[in-house]
Amino acid sequence: MSQSPAAHVPVLYTQVLDGLQVTENGTYLDGTFGRGGHARGVLEHLGPGGRLLVMDKDPEAIAVAEHSFGGDARVSIHRGSFAGLGQVVAAATVDGILLDLGVSSPQLDVAGRGFSFGKDGPLDMRMDPDSGQSAAEWLAQASDREIADVLWTYGEERQSRRIARAIVARRAEQPLLRTAQLADLIASVMPRGDSKTHPATRSFQAIRIHINRELADLEAGLDAALGALKPGGRLAVISFHSLEDRIVKQFMARYAKAPPSNRRLPEAQPFVATLQLVSGAIKADDAELHVNPRARSAVLRVAEKLGLGNGESGMGKGNSAAASRFPTADSPFPASANGDAA
């Protein structure tokens, strides 16, 4: 393995566990296992009757999961995207779900995965290298308009058209097969500026999101997670850029708050909340950033599924006990969600 599980530093570790409020006999799902940092924390709080389901579409992550937890009867391992978690668990059976979005540190750190503009490697970018087109294959056949649309939509890259034209012109001379080729090409056509950010940052992000269908998977995964949670179950989502966080924030708000039109106009069926917001946006503190600078852009949001139609939390005594056991005095999460978090 490129990086040992022990060396992996999960972001917002304490905040995630506080947000999930793990109970000894609960059932939990980690939809983005990665190197298992958060999963280990969940397992530490599970008793013999608890259950943890882990998912990842990266075969290297699945290999780590099997090596680390293959002998633990409480753990079930599934290779695939969290967008399909509804095929892994039945409806209303899970006490907590974690989605840690985006590319993992091991994927970025290994040049051979093709995610990093700072390390030369094959231009791949697939989280599942056995599925779909690689970045090189897509860039070899996409039109300049298609490329520009992706760079703008998923990277908010202002120079998207200029970069797209440069890619199409260069591939007519030689194929773009390496990350360094693409990064250098993008840098060569970008206006000079004082930004400390590498000029290829937004383009690499955009291409990666497109290749892996990340935002479509996120929308499907959030819907599936809501269906899989029990009343009182909690959904914790870590995002790393504004596009992801916007989707998560809007999803949680859609099921937690009546839209403005419902407050002004009579409705045949009044709005009934399905989720309760447990927290606003939670970010890493200075101490964590000192140890793990990659946590700087991480944003955690947590919501709790409500009981059917009563507008109240479905948390039972087991979850209340967990609240007194696991959260610390300075935890950003209340023991139960009886009002919208600030």
From Swiss-Prot:
Biological process (GO), any one: rRNA base methylation
Region (Disordered): 311-342
EC number: 2.1.1.199
GO molecular function: rRNA (cytosine-N4-)-methyltransferase activity
UniProtKB keywords: Cytoplasm, Methyltransferase, rRNA processing, S-adenosyl-L-methionine, Transferase
Reactions catalysed, as given in the entry: cytidine(1402) in 16S rRNA + S-adenosyl-L-methionine = N(4)-methylcytidine(1402) in 16S rRNA + S-adenosyl-L-homocysteine + H(+)
Source superkingdom: Bacteria
InterPro entries tied to this protein: RsmH, SAM-dep_MeTrfase_MraW_recog, SAM-dependent_MTases_sf
UniProt cross-references to Pfam families, sorted A to Z: Methyltransf_5
Subcellular location: Cytoplasm
Residues holding S-adenosyl-L-methionine: G36, G37, H38, D56, F82, D100, Q107
Gene Ontology CC terms: cytoplasm
HAMAP family, per database record: 16SrRNA_methyltr_H (MF_01007)
Similarity comment text for this entry: Belongs to the methyltransferase superfamily. RsmH family.
Summary of the function given for this chain in its UniProt record: Specifically methylates the N4 position of cytidine in position 1402 (C1402) of 16S rRNA.
Name this protein carries in UniProt: Ribosomal RNA small subunit methyltransferase H
Originating species: Xanthomonas axonopodis pv. citri (strain 306)
